[in-house]
Amino acid sequence: GEVAVPWTEMVARHYGTNDELHLAFNFPPLFAPWEASSWRERIDQTRSALDARDAWPTWVLSNHDNRRHRTRYGSEARARAAAVLLLALRGTPFLYAGEELGLEDAVIPPGRTLDPGGRDGCRAPLPWDAEPGHGWGAHEPWLPWPPDAAHRNVDTLREEAGSILQLSRRLLAARRASPALRLGEFRWLPAP
């Protein structure tokens, strides 16, 4: 379910075994700035609030209502690091279409904005290939393509050694193969 509230403690109240939710998007981590202390705080809050109710955690970096994490964090290196974190945490990760390509929000020219909430940029179509229609056909989509769609598309990144798509696939394969990544606990270690 979607529980659009700003605190994990409030999300946790909607979990249960009767008429309540068994799984809900947990939005507070989505709003974490690119700071280790902020991420740690949100992860700890999520674990504490949901573990207290024997509830299953979920993790979200981007969605159709918020700027893509690559856009928010400002670089592919940060988007890759966030993907590693997302897919290493116990719980259910949600990948928004295009995260595995490192897509940024599309730039919407004045006059083409349709969503009154300004969410069009994160809703741009996913580019499948480098051709002009990016795998969607000859017609122009109602939203413009994300930046660098000629390179950041499934066909190109599938073949590019070390691409963020290849990283995402390796991380997902490791997660499927490792119960520890899906179900295990972790502890924080001090960093220099």
What role is predicted for each listed range?
Residues 30:
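Catalytic-adjacent loop/helix segments of enzymes that bind and process anionic phosphate/sulfate esters
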Residues 3-6, 10, 14-26, 34, ...:
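Loop/helix patches that line or flank the sugar-binding groove of alpha-linked glycan CAZymes
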